[in-house]
Amino acid sequence: MIPKIIWQTYKTNAPPKRAANNIKSWTTHNPNHKYRYSSDLQCEAFIRDYFDKEFIKMYNSLPIGVMKADVWRAAIIYQFGGIYADLDTECRGPASLWIGEDDSLVVTVENKSGAIGNYIFAAIPKHPAIYSVLESFIEIYQSDTFLNKRSPTPVQDFGAHGWSIGILKYYGLNKPEIMEQGGEAYNKYAKVILDRVRFYTSESKILSAYPNENTLVYHQTASVFWLEGYESWRLEQERQLGVFGV
């Protein structure tokens, strides 16, 4: 059974005001779940307490906060299990509507390429597929492309790209399968939310899907649409462009 814990994070001890209603939506719709919020300092302490020196070195070397947050979310769910949700996700119904008693891993597909999204997911502790994701982060960190700062998409490498690499590797899937079958290829192994209305994100609009009364999770894509009182990771990435020479 996936533990009834909701995990969220932001750089400071206090989340941005724009996230207040979203946080409330998760606790209101899931009163039987524990809620856990971690600042950057708390995330760093967790990584330091639970992982080995190589993993800590990788984590500390990441130059942009969102990259560390991407690693932390996989690490915290691997260690304790539960639900991870970005602060810019609104919960519109109980998690029990999309997490079954026998589920061990629940993920969603971001787009037609079959990339696994990491803005929301749920798993039991020590799930081997999540461990594979953590291994993929180490492999990316140790690659010549990353070490020589030649990656054109360093943030994505530790986001949906790295996440998908780990999941694909664990389940023995490959890109041609995913391109042909989309998210259906994953359903042999884990519950995958494919309905872009039930799990709505900004990309869904491009695919002519819109949120309605059946939408359970609404990803508001803060890095694009939130402005006042919220600093997008995209701005931090712009300040750090020289780090990767892109």
Where are these regions (language model features)?
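Glycosyltransferase-associated regions of secretory-pathway enzymes
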Residues: 1-69, 85-246
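Small-residue hinge/turn detector
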Residues: 70-82
